[in-house]
Amino acid sequence: MKVTLIAILTCAAVLVLHTTAAEELEAESQLMEVGMPDTELAAVDEERLFECSVSCEIEKEGNKDCKKKKCIGGWKCKFNMCVKV
């Protein structure tokens, strides 16, 4: 009886680990596919552009010199826009 229970639990654990590994591989393969449109990255780019220009416009309306928002992650603020360095 104990041996059967141990065997069943072992098989269940192996099945769970195998399923998890398969899901990770599938996710990696989708990320590595060439030619897929990178819409999420494009959305982030547009967001950065918007945030940078809006922050600069707010400072201009307050009669202050425009101190451009510091962009992070390989980006810099130039001409009221975040651009990739």
UniProtKB/Swiss-Prot annotation:
InterPro entries, per database record: Hwtx-2-like (IPR012625)
Subcellular location: Secreted
A GO term, aspect molecular function: toxin activity
Signal peptide positions on this chain: 1-22
Expression sites (tissue/organ): Expressed by the venom gland.
Propeptide, residue positions: 23-48
Cysteines joined through disulfide linkages: C52-C66, C56-C77, C71-C82
Pfam families named in the record: Toxin_20
GO cellular component: extracellular region; host cell postsynaptic membrane
Main localization category: secreted
UniProt keyword terms in alphabetical order: Disulfide bond, Neurotoxin, Postsynaptic neurotoxin, Secreted, Signal, Toxin
Record's function text: Postsynaptic neurotoxin.
Family to which this protein belongs: Belongs to the neurotoxin 12 (Hwtx-2) family. 02 (Hwtx-2) subfamily.
Protein name stated in the entry: U4-theraphotoxin-Hhn1h
Organism: Cyriopagopus hainanus
